[in-house]
């Protein structure tokens, strides 16, 4: 998320609120919280929005154990969520052999969906934004995807909600 200084936090929350309304005002939102800038910004926006819209907000941090900083990331996320009064679960996953990036992504999405089911969450909020969308479309194009693949990610796909998708 390339932070645009012209967009203040209230405007960001308004964008997330518009997306929230567009996807039907889900009552239970589970945030995929990596601890990176994008997901932390979305966490703060959702905490602010929760005061206006009165939904249940929780978070899940998927711990792949692939980086030396993985434990510190999990501790950071837990401390931040405690400070913001957001329930958080850290889920440890095993990444199989093969394409490490693809295996990690598959393990992450399995963990997200399992946690969403366990919490009866209506949506899983992801912090994908316009830069991620461009990257996705380019990767699909390079792999020879047709028109469907070049469409990119949707704001709501199944129970995956991307409220920042239109933001640079």
Regions found by a protein language model. Give the residues of each.
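Core alpha/beta nucleotide-donor-binding catalytic domains of modification enzymes
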Residues: 3-168
